[in-house]
């Protein structure tokens, strides 16, 4: 399985059950609190990652937009060296994300036509090794095998974000101490 979502066929229908819909409706009562927590987490990531060369935290691009801060993502400069990157795609991917409920699928090869940069995968694996779950940004739809023959209108931005981006933990249970630990492990993974 790959550490990013790879869609090779169409045919799954993951509709929300009535129970999940009820849980979702109940979550609406704490939505503002969750968004405030995510916003606080983003601010903490911003403060703790300030000055880390080669890593940029994605922020709200303009006051004209209002982010829900669902994901806190970083971009790794391609020239940033991360420990272990030289061997990162030589073995089967560990800690890969799966489909519904974490179900993983067997990968036919170690590589696909498009995958995150070596330093991004090395950082994901370094974080995974210390119990921190992260994942690459979503693979662009036009790069998914299932859509390879479809028309596309692209400018390179989605490919660049996919190759350089990493999603960091930011859920409602992530504490300030967790963020400090995550950032410290990010710093530990960077070659000096």
Question: Locations of the language-model features?
Answer:
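PLP-dependent aminotransferase class I/II
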Residues: 1-192
């Amino acid at each position: 399985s790959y550490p990013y979502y790879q869609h090779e066929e169409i045919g799954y229908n993951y509709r929300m059950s009535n129970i999940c819909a009820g849980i979702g409706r109940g979550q609406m009562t704490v939505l503002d609190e969750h968004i405030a927590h995510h916003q606080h987490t983003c601010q903490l990531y911003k403060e703790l990652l300030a000055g880390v060369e080669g890593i940029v935290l994605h922020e709200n691009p303009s006051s004209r937009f209002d982010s829900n801060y669902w994901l806190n993502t970083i971009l790794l400069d391609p020239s940033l060296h991360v420990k272990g990157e030289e061997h990162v795609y030589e073995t089967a991917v560990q800690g890969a994300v799966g489909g519904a409920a974490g179900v993983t699928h067997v990968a036919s090869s170690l590589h696909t036509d498009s995958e995150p940069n070596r330093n991004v995968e090395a950082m994901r694996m370094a974080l995974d090794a210390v119990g921190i779950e992260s994942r690459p940004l979503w693979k662009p739809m036009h790069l998914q095998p299932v859509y390879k023959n479809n028309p596309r209108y692209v400018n390179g931005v989605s490919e660049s974000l996919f190759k350089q981006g990493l999603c960091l933990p930011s859920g409602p249970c992530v504490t300030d101490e967790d963020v400090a630990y995550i950032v410290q492990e990010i710093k530990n993974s960077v070659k000096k």
